[in-house]
């Protein structure tokens, strides 16, 4: 079998945590989680498009999140609301082409967009407006990287829950 270029122990652990949260008996790759609430196989493009379309048509996420580069810092601001959530920074490669050695895509070159290469909790949100500043060079080290900031509830089991706010900053790498 071909090894997934973007796999990591952390990603696998997160997939199993989502399986617990979403009461799913399956973990597979590639797997997409939409807004922390819906699990979809990338092998089901029609279903994926429907889930994304439905999520896009739903009311906006309830908590405003803004992220911007200011000088050498990434500055994140959230609005207020109710409950608690983790503030998570997701680092991604905006575009990466990989030659697949084996498997159903063996011999092909596939281009991935926005493949997450790192996740880190950067704060705890307690329902009040929050500002977090991070040194850009500590998190965004390579050209072609971007980041997303997710405000994500945690379930009673301690697993990832619903995303209640989000922001994206593209083209942020060195």
Annotate each language-model stretch with its function.
Residues 2-29, 37-174:
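Short, conserved sequence motifs used for protein processing/export or organelle targeting and
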Residues 32:
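Ligand-binding face of N-terminal immunoglobulin V-set domains in extracellular IgSF glycoproteins
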């Amino acid at each position: 079998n071909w090894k997934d270029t973007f796999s990591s122990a952390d990603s696998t652990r997160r997939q199993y945590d989502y399986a617990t949260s979403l009461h799913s008996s399956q973990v597979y790759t590639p797997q997409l989680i939409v807004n922390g609430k819906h699990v979809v196989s990338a092998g089901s493009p029609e279903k994926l498009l429907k889930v994304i379309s439905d999520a896009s048509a739903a009311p906006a996420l309830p908590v405003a999140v803004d992220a911007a580069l200011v000088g050498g810092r990434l500055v994140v601001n959230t609005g207020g609301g109710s409950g608690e959530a983790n503030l998570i920074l997701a680092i991604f490669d905006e575009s990466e082409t990989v030659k697949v050695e084996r498997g159903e895509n063996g011999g092909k070159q596939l281009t991935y967009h926005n493949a997450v290469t790192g996740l880190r909790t950067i704060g705890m949100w307690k329902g009040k407006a929050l500002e977090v500043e991070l040194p850009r060079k500590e998190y965004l080290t390579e050209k072609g990287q971007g980041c997303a900031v997710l405000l994500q509830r945690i379930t009673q089991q301690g697993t990832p829950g619903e995303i209640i706010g989000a922001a994206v900053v593209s083209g942020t790498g060195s």
